[in-house]
From Swiss-Prot:
Keywords: Ribonucleoprotein, Ribosomal protein. Belongs to the eukaryotic ribosomal protein eS1 family. GO terms for molecular function: structural constituent of ribosome. InterPro entries: Ribosomal_eS1, Ribosomal_eS1_arc, Ribosomal_eS1_CS. It comes from Thermococcus sibiricus (strain DSM 12597 / MM 739). It holds the Pfam family Ribosomal_S3Ae. This is Small ribosomal subunit protein eS1. GO terms for cellular component: ribonucleoprotein complex; ribosome. GO terms for biological process: translation.
């Protein structure tokens, strides 16, 4: 088998990159339509469907939000601009590890909910109690978590729900309610995944 000259291979790869255009990727309107990255492609259709990962810090400029990861999917391209939809978020593992220490209790809850405007979401809440707690207290905290998340979904639109979850407002409300059962270190909405959008 004839060997391909490494220089020719490198030149061919370089030519492929020359043929690609760079598209500017923007966050959805409810995140301010800010620029969140660049992505290369040789034709616009190949850009659609790509997932862009960024952080809430990069979107808002708030340096305290670097642990909040955001995921957006490109759904439309106009010229050199690529527009996205929110697909989910999660807290960085290192941040979660920093909260969970010895002799604390981590209480998780996973709930499928539908927002006021028909978006189906999988929402994962997390509460950290400052000490080891009894199983009955753990169940009570999880019930509070579920009640609050389901109530929020019924009352809020998709954009309102997502913003309250990622900016910490929903977690703060959860903490206020759950600490009536046992003293807490932290409460967070640690992950959201968009399962389905309402049918047009």
């Amino acid at each position: 088998m004839a060997k391909v000259n490494p220089r020719k291979r490198a030149a061919a790869a370089k030519d492929k990159w020359k043929l690609k255009d760079w598209y500017i990727v923007y966050a959805p309107e409810f995140f301010g339509n800010v620029e969140i990255g660049l992505t290369p492609a040789d034709e616009p259709e190949k850009v659609k469907g790509r997932i862009i990962e960024t952080t809430l810090r990069d979107v808002t400029g708030d340096f305290t939000k670097g642990h909040v990861k955001l995921y957006f999917r490109i759904h439309d391209v106009k010229g050199q601009n690529a527009y996205t939809k929110f697909k989910g978020h999660k807290l960085a593992r290192s941040y979660i590890r920093s909260l969970v220490r010895r002799r604390t209790t981590r209480i998780d809850g996973i709930f499928n909910v539908t927002t006021k405007d028909g978006y189906k979401l999988r929402v994962m809440g997390m509460v950290i109690a400052i000490r080891r707690i009894q199983s009955s207290q753990e169940r009570a905290v999880r019930e509070v978590m579920e009640d609050l998340i389901r109530k929020k979904a019924e009352e809020l639109t998709f954009t309102e729900f997502v913003l309250e979850a990622v900016n910490g407002k929903m977690g703060a409300e959860l903490a206020r309610e759950a600490k009536k059962i046992y003293p807490l270190k932290r409460a967070e909405i640690r992950k959201i995944k968009v399962l389905a959008e309402p049918e047009a």
